[in-house]
Regions:
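Intrinsically disordered, low-complexity terminal regions
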Residues: 1-198
């Protein structure tokens, strides 16, 4: 059963498997996938430990996979041109199967990762692209973009060795690393033990 709670300005999609207490739920080991058909978006915000796989495609689509009794704990919310992915408030659980969100969208201008989840984005083709990490999660990118800006506050890493770019700007506060390419210019600011390889 799926519950859709949508207002005019804040469209919340609560993907619901079983309605139960959120305290210490153990994953069933049975995988379930829910499909969400969203409005167009270009920004992805991830909060928590969910892994996200993003592919550039003409048709926007979101698929959420998890233990069938934990899918209800994952929230997908739309705010303008952004989609937020995270957990319901006070959720407490132990997974048996991996939690994975697959996203297709025609344009991706920004990824913001807060937490320990990992994000992969493939086939980027942008004029401007931004990615930020607050936490220990990693971001892996490929494709092309004229101007890219990366920021890390924590221990997460950004691997953009397969993202062709002209101009690069990197800001690191912490121990995170960035591997990237830039054919025209690179501006780097590091506060902490993080490393940048261009």
């Amino acid at each position: 059963m799926r519950f859709f709670n949508m207002s005019r300005n804040n469209k919340n999609v609560i993907i619901d498997g079983h309605r139960m207490s959120c305290n210490g739920i153990k994953g069933s080991g049975i995988t379930k996938t829910i499909t969400v058909n969203p409005e167009p978006f270009s920004r992805v915000n991830l909060i928590g430990s969910i892994d996200v796989d993003i592919t550039i495609s003409d048709t926007p689509l979101i698929q959420v996979t998890a233990d069938d009794n934990l899918v209800d704990l994952i929230e997908v919310s739309f705010f303008g041109d952004s989609v937020d992915i995270g957990f319901k408030e006070n959720a407490s659980f132990n997974t048996n199967k991996p939690m994975l969100v697959k996203i297709s969208c025609p344009i991706l201008s920004r990824i913001a990762l807060s937490g320990s989840g990992d994000v992969t984005a493939s086939n980027l083709n942008q004029e401007n692209f931004e990615a930020s990490i607050a936490g220990s999660g990693d971001i892996t990118l490929d494709g092309s973009a004229k101007n890219i800006a990366f920021s890390i506050n924590g221990s997460g890493d950004i691997d953009a060795t397969h993202l062709k770019a002209e101009n690069l700007e990197v800001t690191i506060a912490g121990s995170g690393d960035v591997d990237a390419t830039a054919t025209v210019s690179a501006h780097v600011r590091v506060s902490g033990s993080g490393n940048v390889k261009v």
